[in-house]
């Protein structure tokens, strides 16, 4: 079977890759509305999760196409992304800890 890169330029794949996170963002916001229920949506929470999974899957497909649909390239890229994400998660937790520790001190 032909690869995506056989039909679309790298630039076109990148354009698609820019669109898909925007769609994932919309799905995430819809899920937030479903969970929060202050601004109701007709979509159920499970359907909202399904939409978010689908859009993230589209992002993953774009990454795969950009990396020439090579499993090793994809795994390497995702591993590098994970390495970059790990310290960011740690910093995020530290910021939250600092903020809520400050709020606890203010309450005393």
Q: Locations of the language-model features?
A:
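Flexible "arm" and connector segments at domain edges
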Residues: 1-108
